[in-house]
């Protein structure tokens, strides 16, 4: 069996694009907490000493946008200009308007439609993916890259590696076998970490600390061997980071948010969007469908696509592919999916409880991935029991 290499990357919560995702979702959380019917399309951008929130929001909630921006930046660790942004003294610009009445009447009839009649907020197609290679039913390359990033933040905030600063990126290359369509990880081929750091630390200490406190606790020993390659801050210096180093924008890390390059992506970002935006709710329901297919033993690996037209409740199409790993034909799995999942946007909101804000619910999704997380707020990760007849093995 010939092996192959596949790579996934991640970025930390202090990466400028991820800062923007978290601000946009913090605004969404605040709106939904006060008014579950809020219509939110909130974008954020940032550059040196400046964060701007802009977009269309229709809500009864009373929102202090500037406070949300500063609180979010502070919680990430942007507390002074030398780490990339000073949450308390940076410029905060706000340019929020109401949702277009044309869109409002077409999608939700100015709140007069029943949930099952609510139309999709826009056209588009979304994909959900699942694979049996990890307990999370997520790709290993993506899981490891994501967990390395989360661990970097953990050891920065708890003081284990006090030289760390908020910005950082990770990348993991995994060697796989293809077992008749199922993905079987063999080993980790390469680990790349580029992390922002202070002026005092040496490259030797960076490498030693990253191996001991970040890589060791995250990557299971069985995947590492003496051939595994480590690139630890290969550029040699990463002091300037965050919005000081690069501009940031909501919605620019859509592969990190999903499956690390596996499966497919329809192109729509998640953060700052309320559940009538099918870019988000549609992607969540097809993840639940794909995960349920694999968890119920219908297949070892699955991708599910759904598509929509603006103002139309029923999906235009639903597609299932199990990459040849299905225990029954894909057309039969598709039938089971259609019988068990309601893809109408208003019903997705109800069935996945997506109008509930607060508890930093959506802000949590905005760093370290929307899928494969063990958190009751991530309702789309709940596996639905699917009834199906096992085909008797031929003698």
From Swiss-Prot:
Cofactor: Mn(2+); Mg(2+); Co(2+); K(+)
Pathway connected to this protein: Amino-acid biosynthesis; S-adenosyl-L-methionine biosynthesis; S-adenosyl-L-methionine from L-methionine: step 1/1
Pfam families in the cross-refs: S-AdoMet_synt_C, S-AdoMet_synt_M, S-AdoMet_synt_N
Keyword Electron transport found: no
Binding site for K(+): 43
Entry superkingdom: Eukaryota
Subcellular location: Cytoplasm
Chain residues that bind L-methionine: 56, 99, 246, 277
Residues the record lists as binding Mg(2+): 9
Keywords of this entry: ATP-binding, Cobalt, Cytoplasm, Magnesium, Metal-binding, Nucleotide-binding, One-carbon metabolism, Potassium, Transferase
Alphabetical list of CDD domains matching this protein: S-AdoMet_synt
GO BP term, pick one: one-carbon metabolic process
Binding, ATP: 15, 167-169, 235-238, 246, 252-253, 269, 273, 277
Gene3D superfamilies, per database record: 3.30.300.10
Cofactor note: Binds 2 divalent ions per subunit. The metal ions interact primarily with the substrate. Can utilize magnesium, manganese or cobalt (in vitro). Binds 1 potassium ion per subunit. The potassium ion interacts primarily with the substrate.
Main location: cytoplasm
GO annotation, cellular component aspect: cytoplasm
Recorded catalytic activity of this chain's protein: L-methionine + ATP + H2O = S-adenosyl-L-methionine + phosphate + diphosphate
GO molecular function terms attached to this record: ATP binding; metal ion binding; methionine adenosyltransferase activity
Family label: Belongs to the AdoMet synthase family.
Main function: Catalyzes the formation of S-adenosylmethionine from methionine and ATP. The reaction comprises two steps that are both catalyzed by the same enzyme: formation of S-adenosylmethionine (AdoMet) and triphosphate, and subsequent hydrolysis of the triphosphate.
HAMAP family attached to this UniProt entry: S_AdoMet_synth1
Subunit structure: Homotetramer.
NCBIfam families xref list: metK
Name used for this protein in its record: S-adenosylmethionine synthase 2
Species annotation: Suaeda salsa (Seepweed)
Gene that encodes the chain: METK2
């Amino acid at each position: 069996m010939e092996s192959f290499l596949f790579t996934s990357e991640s970025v930390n919560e202090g990466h400028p694009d991820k800062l923007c995702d978290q601000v946009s979702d913090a605004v969404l959380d605040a709106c939904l907490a006060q008014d579950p019917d809020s219509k939110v399309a909130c974008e954020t951008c940032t550059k040196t000493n400046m964060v701007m929130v802009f977009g269309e929001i229709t809500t009864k909630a009373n929102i202090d946008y500037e406070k949300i921006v500063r609180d979010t930046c502070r919680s990430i660790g942007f507390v002074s200009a030398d780490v990339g942004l000073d949450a308390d003294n940076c410029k905060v610009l706000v340019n929020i308007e109401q949702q277009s009445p044309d869109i409002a009447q077409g999608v939700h009839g100015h709140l007069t439609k029943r949930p099952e009649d609510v139309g999709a907020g826009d056209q588009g197609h979304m994909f959900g993916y699942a694979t049996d290679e990890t307990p999370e039913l997520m790709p290993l390359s993506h899981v490891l890259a994501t967990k390395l990033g989360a661990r970097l933040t953990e050891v920065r905030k708890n003081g284990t590696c006090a030289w760390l600063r908020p910005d950082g990126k990770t990348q993991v290359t995994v060697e796989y076998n293809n077992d008749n369509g199922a993905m079987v990880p063999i080993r980790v081929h390469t680990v790349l970490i580029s992390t922002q750091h202070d002026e005092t630390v040496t490259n030797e200490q960076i490498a030693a600390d990253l191996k001991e406190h970040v890589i060791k606790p995250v990557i299971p020993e069985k995947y590492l061997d003496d051939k595994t390659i480590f690139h630890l801050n290969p550029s040699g210096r990463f002091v300037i980071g965050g919005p000081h180093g690069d501009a940031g924008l909501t919605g620019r890390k859509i592969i990190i948010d999903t499956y690390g390059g596996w499966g497919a992506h329809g192109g729509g970002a998640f953060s700052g969007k309320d559940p009538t935006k099918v870019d988000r709710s549609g992607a969540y329901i097809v993840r639940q469908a794909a995960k349920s297919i694999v968890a119920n033993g219908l297949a070892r690996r699955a991708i599910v696509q759904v598509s929509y037209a603006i103002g139309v409740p029923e999906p235009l199409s639903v597609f299932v592919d199990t990459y040849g790993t299905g225990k029954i034909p894909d057309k039969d799995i598709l039938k089971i999916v259609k019988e068990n999942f309601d893809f109408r946007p208003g019903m997705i909101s109800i069935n996945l409880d997506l109008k509930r804000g607060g508890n930093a619910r959506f802000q949590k999704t905005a760093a370290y991935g929307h899928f494969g997380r063990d958190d009751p707020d991530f309702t789309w990760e709940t596996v639905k029991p699917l009834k199906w007849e096992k085909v008797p093995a031929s003698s």
